[in-house]
């Protein structure tokens, strides 16, 4: 069976445990849902002319999707501390299915941009699933469970691009959106049947709930600091994964298929998630954070060296992905421990900062590359995790 606990008591705030199969299913769901944000990234140049969007505005597709996701994190994810979680997951996933289907059908550039924003807005179910799993997992294994599920999220981010590139060769770009819509419908159906229920005990109006998100951000310095560290790291992650394919195709003779293989190799970095979970459970969160914040700028600087070939880009991809995932899970574990009854809102603050960083990174990537080329751009990208490292070392007493 997918789960041994299909229903959790409506006032359950105590962990009841998750089967290994359920953890694997949640990891798959996280990866599949978050992939919606990135399917368009490698194929925007195919989409834009067919819907009448200028090449100068093509990057808006990706940016609006990520900003929509950040908006959903801030305005929709906190509902998981107020409403029954399974119903929210099913509702948002079905809404994502509809918006993806409409995006595949539309021929209007303005409508496609609106739908891009809505795809991001409705793909927030992943950020309800993660704190739900944290609620259900026992304290002793919570880091491991969250780490395993977050590995699915990072794999979804990394594999969505090569998958999109491969699907577009067979089905065209509209087929990519139709396939994603069908997958969301299937996930909604399975979660409606198999996902454990959780009805929070927190009572408040929606306005008070959203206001409390900002109250939590003010109350917990650890939340602000962890959000800033990971936001800077994810901005560098987004910049790298936007810039590297351009560099590889322009100066290293890579084809779209080669870039897809490059992304697949980079996905090896997802092994950091379960490692991070075990480190957190063992009380080594600070050491793991230091390793992550050191690893990211060093990897980027090696890739920025004059004369560095594509091999260094591959190494950088693996190490950067490892560092980003390691720090994300360690930070998430620490943030969740601040207030067990507010995990969805804490997660909203944490993940909003991350994906705002990612959206800004993807927005400035192309202008940065066109003005400064690969080597100077890579140095600039390395400054972001270096700044996070400096902030971490200066506040050692807090985090």
Show where each model-derived region lies.
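C-terminal transmembrane helical hairpin of 12-TM major facilitator-type secondary transporters
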Residues: 286-331
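Intracellular juxtamembrane helix-capping segments at the cytosolic ends
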Residues: 125-137, 326-339
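Helix-loop-helix hairpin linking two adjacent transmembrane segments in secondary transporters
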Residues: 111, 141, 148-195
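Cytoplasmic helix-loop-helix junction between adjacent transmembrane helices
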Residues: 115-152
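Structural signature of the two symmetry-related core transmembrane helices
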Residues: 87-101, 287-302, 382
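Juxtamembrane intracellular "pre-TM" segments in multi-pass secondary transporters
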Residues: 8-16, 195-228
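Helix-to-loop junctions at the C-terminal end of transmembrane segments
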Residues: 73-84, 272-285, 369
